[in-house]
Swiss-Prot record:
It catalyses: N(omega)-hydroxy-L-arginine + 2 Fe(II)-[cytochrome b5] + 2 H(+) = L-arginine + 2 Fe(III)-[cytochrome b5] + H2O. Ubiquitinated by PRKN during mitophagy, leading to its degradation and enhancement of mitophagy. Deubiquitinated by USP30. Keywords: Isopeptide bond, Membrane, Mitochondrion, Mitochondrion outer membrane, Molybdenum, Oxidoreductase, Peroxisome, Ubl conjugation. The keyword rRNA-binding does not apply. It comes from Sus scrofa. One of its GO terms (cellular component) is mitochondrial outer membrane. This is Mitochondrial amidoxime reducing component 2. It is an enzyme of class 1 (oxidoreductase). Its EC number is 1.7.-.-. There is a cross-link at K10, K31 (Glycyl lysine isopeptide (Lys-Gly) (interchain with G-Cter in ubiquitin)). Binds 1 Mo-molybdopterin (Mo-MPT) cofactor per subunit. Component of a complex composed of cytochrome b5, NADH-cytochrome b5 reductase (CYB5R3) and MTARC2. It is found in: Peroxisome; Mitochondrion outer membrane. Its cofactor is Mo-molybdopterin.
Length: 40
């Protein structure tokens, strides 16, 4: 799973979700964060 921080989501291949990834643990936190492209 590749996650890229972005400002907006305009690509149909991706779904925009509000999430962050803890850089130390790699744990995804869906409750807080910046918009990202996430492969679905």
């Amino acid at each position: 799973l590749w996650i890229y921080p972005v400002k907006s989501c305009k690509t149909e291949a991706y779904r925009c979700i509000l999430t962050t990834v803890d850089p130390d643990t790699g744990v995804i936190d869906r409750k807080v964060g910046d918009p990202v492209y996430r492969m679905v």
